[in-house]
Amino acid sequence: MHIKTLTVSQLNRYVKNTLDADFILNNASVKGEISNLKIHSSGHIYFSLKDGGSKINCVMFKSYAYNLKFAPENGMDVVALGNVSVYEKEGSYQLYVKDMKREGIGDLYVAFEKLKEKLKEEELFDDVHKKEIPKFSKKVGVITSPTGAALKDIINVTKRRNKGIELLIYPALVQGTDASRTLIEGIKILNKVEDVDIIILARGGGSIEELWAFNNEELAYAVYNSKKPIITGVGHETDFTIVDFVSDRRAPTPSAAAEIAVFDREVLINEILNYKYNIKNYMENIIKEKRNYLNLYKQKIEANSPTNIIVNEYKNIDNLKELLNMKIEGKLNKEKNNLSRLSSLLEAHNPLNVLKKGYTLIEDEGNNLITEKEALKKLNKINIIFKDGRAKLSIEYIEEF
């Protein structure tokens, strides 16, 4: 008997065609509990359906997911309607879900909600109990798997943000029967390390079963009673565990937890430089303002100082002196002009000027001016005054006209 050799692609295609031709598999109705739920940004929903003995991968494309009457969650019991086919690229078969109805709530989900309600009534979730996250931690304790992707993400974020931060790793189990015990032990030990400022409790994504260790009641009390603040970064953004509600801060991922715990050195330096610049400008403005006030007061003081008052009075005296001199000089000039005018007038009436024209004056011996001939009759001698001298004469006779 000759056996035909097939390529991988041919084999996967043959299996796919076989499954697609099966009536039952093309109209399958499968009951199970949702696990490992992922809602993609495209709108497609990826998850697994499981029961006590097995599980099958499922996908529900956006066009069908849009018609769902409820929001699927991990732990829900559902009945999924669709067809079973092969994803040729991976060689895996899965259920392509076209519709889904809620059947009931899974056992794990029931246990989760029951514990959540119990701890809520005990006020373990209240914000009043949340410890403040230190802004500038120097040493960060990390409780996680030493081989998991979560630790690598935390280390990478720490190196990127601040290489000076020390990480103290406590290697713990993050899933399985003993996981909760090792996580509790890690919290106790790191609380005894005096210089640990904050603790990160982390693991990567997984199904509700894989994350179940973080829904442990004793672990919840350990987180609540921790003296040091705890940040949880468990699973993906859509995953919520009990410790997320109890912790002092819940981060959607391990990387996000590291972003919160480790301050960015460059950002801090820039903030300090900005503060320095702002303080410098603030102080310069204050100094400038005070200097202006000082100059203003200085001007006022100088304006009212005795020295300035005396100087100003001296200036006033000088001005008055100059004004007085001007007035005196004006008065003198005026009097000079008057004197000159009177002198000219007097000169014009000076008898000597008449003598210059050939006339003479006659005086008696007492130098009294004689203007009539009758006065001569009583005199024997007279004085004759010329323009350039005088003569004494005797009267011999008087002739009348």
From Swiss-Prot:
Heterooligomer composed of large and small subunits. It catalyses: Exonucleolytic cleavage in either 5'- to 3'- or 3'- to 5'-direction to yield nucleoside 5'-phosphates. Keywords: Cytoplasm, Exonuclease, Hydrolase, Nuclease. PANTHER family: EXODEOXYRIBONUCLEASE 7 LARGE SUBUNIT (PTHR30008:SF0). It holds the Pfam family tRNA_anti_2. Belongs to the XseA family. It comes from the Bacteria. NCBIfam families: xseA (TIGR00237). It comes from Clostridium botulinum (strain Langeland / NCTC 10281 / Type F). It is an enzyme of class 3 (hydrolase). GO terms for cellular component: cytoplasm; exodeoxyribonuclease VII complex. Bidirectionally degrades single-stranded DNA into large acid-insoluble oligonucleotides, which are then degraded further into small acid-soluble oligonucleotides. GO terms for molecular function: exodeoxyribonuclease VII activity; nucleic acid binding. It is found in: Cytoplasm. Its main location: cytoplasm. One of its GO terms (biological process) is DNA catabolic process. This is Exodeoxyribonuclease 7 large subunit. The lineage of its organism: Bacteria, Bacillati, Bacillota, Clostridia, Eubacteriales. Its EC number is 3.1.11.6.
